Each structure stands twice: as structure tokens, then as C-alpha cells.
A protein has these predicted regions:
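Mature catalytic domains of secreted/periplasmic carbohydrate-active enzymes
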Residues: 1-248
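Extracellular Ig-like/FN3 beta-sandwich strand-entry sites
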Residues: 250-252
Length: 254
């Protein structure tokens, strides 16, 4: 660990697959080492007591449970000392420990679950529509998204994977970068008035998480053909909640 954390500059994230064996159970003093060498890195399932922790969401399919609160009643689920109760977090928890949804660009039935390369498996790369759905069920459910890319025998990400990763970014930007209307504010009710009836199938919600996660429940309604209809409802919003529902022609959203 000393070699890896000392020779490659500042690391954005350190991944502890399966967690960290605590000192009480015979493990090394990883906490002291990471605090000394990479104190600003994010640690996935890192040692208990480290402040920059994120937690697993329970699968490697980009499908976060909902709700998935960024706060929890303990800071890690895999150090042998503290255990988070379930995968949903706790809206009243004392620790900031957001979920991270990891998934691969290649399907789970490819070599080693899509985390490692094998020849002649380019056909197992997910389609852009499938990847967009994973984006909505990970980032759109208040979790960080980690996309696993394979490295081929030449030490490179294969061209097919590079192409699909770019297409993935393109479809995210196409879908979300130019919303029909944006609004922000305070209070118990916010509304968006559209100039004319408009077909809508997604609404993106976001809290200012500098103040924590304060919304515990919400409802979305729309005025459709002169009648109010409920579009969706939920609990956790956090940094991003993407509500995807059947297309409606709306003039006002609440």
C-alpha cells in the first residue's frame, strides 16, 4: 500500500473491494497509512474512522436501492467493527457516507463479470439505452456512479469500449444538458409554468447538499388537459433524483 499510495500522485478514490480487515481482527493499520499518504482521497468501504467514506449499494449492476440516503448510522459496512443496517442509509444518521453504484461497460456474463478483458467479447458491451437506464438508477438515485472499463493485452482500453463510453456521455448530455425549464427556491411548494403543453417524461430534482439532505418526502404533479395528475412521489432527493415516468403533455408542473 505504501508503494501504491506514494508513487502516483494524489489519488481521487481508493477502492477496498470487500472492505478492510480491522486491527482488532488481525488487519494492518490502514487508517493511519491512508491518513498519512492520501488524506484527501475517497475510500470505498474503507477503514472505520476515516472521514471520506462511501459505501456499496449491494450489487454491481448500477441499480441503487431507493431510497439511498447519503447519511448512515455507521460509516462503513465491512470493517468488522461497525455495520450499516441495510443498504438504504438513514435520513437521520450521524455519518455522511454516500452510496456508490459500480457497474461495468460489458455485461456480467463476459469474462470475470465484465471487469477484465478477453478477446472476442466486444458484442457484450451494453447499449447506450441500457447504460442510460443505469445512469438513472444510480446517479438518479442519489449515488455516485463508477463505470468499470477493461484493459486489453496492449495495456489500453479497447477501441469499441472507448467508442461506447463516448456515446454514453453523449446520450447523457443530450438527455439532460438542456432542460425545458429550470427553477430553484425555498419553501414547501415550487411550480414550473410552461408556455404551452409540452411532452415531459423526466424531471430532475436536486438539493443543495451543503446543508445536508433535508427533504424527507415529496410529490410531483402536473396539469394535463386541465386536470391535475400525480406524476410520481418519493422520499430521498439528495444530490440528484431523476424521476422517469410515462410521457404526459403538461402545462404546469408542481
Amino acid at each position: 500500500m505504501t508503494e501504491l499510495w506514494s508513487n502516483y500522485g494524489k489519488l481521487f478514490e481508493i477502492w477496498f473491494d470487500g472492505g478492510v480487515l480491522s486491527q482488532q481482527n488481525g488487519g494492518a493499520d490502514i487508517l493511519t497509512l491512508i491518513q498519512r499518504l492520501q488524506p484527501n482521497s475517497i475510500a470505498f468501504q474503507g477503514p472505520y474512522g476515516y472521514p471520506n467514506l462511501i459505501r456499496w449499494v449491494g450489487n454491481e449492476e448500477g441499480n441503487s436501492p431507493y431510497p439511498c440516503w447519503a447519511t448512515a448510522d455507521a460509516t462503513t459496512s465491512a470493517d468488522g467493527v461497525q455495520k450499516i443496517k441495510g443498504l438504504y442509509g438513514n435520513p437521520h444518521g450521524n455519518y455522511w457516507c454516500p452510496g456508490e453504484a459500480d457497474f461495468t461497460l460489458r455485461r456480467n456474463d463476459s469474462f470475470q463479470g465484465g471487469w477484465f478483458w478477453r478477446a472476442n467479447e466486444d458484442h457484450l458491451i451494453f447499449s447506450t439505452d441500457e447504460l442510460l437506464l443505469k445512469y438513472e438508477t444510480s446517479v438518479g438515485r442519489n449515488t455516485n456512479m463508477l463505470l468499470g472499463l477493461v484493459i486489453d493485452k496492449n495495456g489500453l482500453v479497447p477501441d469499441a469500449d472507448v467508442k461506447r463510453a463516448k456515446e454514453f456521455g453523449d446520450i447523457i448530455r443530450k438527455t439532460f444538458s438542456k432542460p425545458i425549464r429550470k427553477i430553484s427556491g425555498k419553501g414547501y411548494e415550487l411550480s414550473i409554468r410552461l408556455n404551452k403543453e409540452t411532452n415531459i417524461s423526466r424531471i430532475v430534482l436536486s438539493e443543495d447538499i451543503a446543508f445536508g439532505e433535508r427533504v424527507l418526502k415529496y410529490k410531483l404533479k402536473g396539469l394535463c388537459n386541465g386536470k391535475w395528475i400525480q406524476l410520481s412521489e418519493g422520499s430521498c432527493i439528495g444530490h440528484k433524483r431523476i424521476e422517469h415516468f410515462p410521457t404526459h403533455s403538461l402545462s404546469v408542473c408542481l
